[in-house]
């Protein structure tokens, strides 16, 4: 997950027998809707033990994911230590197949997929 400080959640009691959770918007708006309404209320009132949703409408290029929670106090510690140059160096030294595409679009990728989620 994004910074290593996230978890995906669902309501185990709402899962039908033999159903495999897909983590989709349809599930969140369907069988998991009561759970996500409860969770939203907890987040909005500061009763979520530091967990929040970062993939929300209007933030960055990652589609909203109600099930994806970030532990904000821990994520912020990592964000404070984030280094563009260190990340770029990792890609430069890597054997990843799309390295040139990543490096050529590096500033755009940071602006669309990294920095919007620093909250």
Positions of the model-derived regions?
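Cell-envelope/glycan interface and biosynthesis
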Residues: 1-119
